[in-house]
């Protein structure tokens, strides 16, 4: 094996390792962080991760392609083709999921705009937010005649605090699994050629 081919394979395997690591980091961040934080303060960080992962995926695919087609026919191993397809396949999974979710969200937003009762309900909740904090009035309003405290309802903003994973997490985990499997098979393939011995 020529030195140039060994270098391109090393760069390809390293790039796909970094790519799968970035996808794993993004999966971990999105599965453990509340949705409001993801759409708010973490958006620039996730955008940077997405751009870096895209660049590394393209870089890895390019070097796997150069390694496969630049090698003599006896050294064209299938792991080079599989490594070349990892980034496009995981990007396809994420792209299809993103397209499906954006259509679903636009449909839900159109349906929710047809029902203005939610805005009236929110306005009535805001008008109830002014409370007289006098001692006698406050105690008599919260305690019914049977002596038990009145049940309190949770307002809409507190209900909106969503701590579960967003919908894209399953698709991101699938793309991460594809990248990790591609990285592992590439490392085994390079090791099988005797490059690490």
UniProtKB/Swiss-Prot annotation:
Keywords: Autophagy, Membrane, Mitochondrion, Phosphoprotein, Transmembrane, Transmembrane helix
Region (Disordered): 135-154
InterPro entries the UniProt entry points to: ATG33 (IPR051668)
The organism of origin for this protein: Saccharomyces cerevisiae (strain ATCC 204508 / S288c) (Baker's yeast)
Localisation: Mitochondrion membrane
An annotated GO cellular component: mitochondrion
Chief site of localization: mitochondrion
Family: Belongs to the ATG33 family.
Biological role: Involved in the selective degradation of mitochondria via autophagy during starvation and at post-log phase.
Name of the protein described by the UniProt record: Autophagy-related protein 33
Coiled coil spans: none
Membrane-topology descriptor: Multi-pass membrane protein
TM region(s), chain numbering: 10-30, 52-72, 78-98, 172-192
Bias (Basic and acidic residues) ranges: 135-148
Endpoints of the signal sequence: none
GO biological process, one term: macroautophagy
Sites of Phosphoserine modification: 127, 129
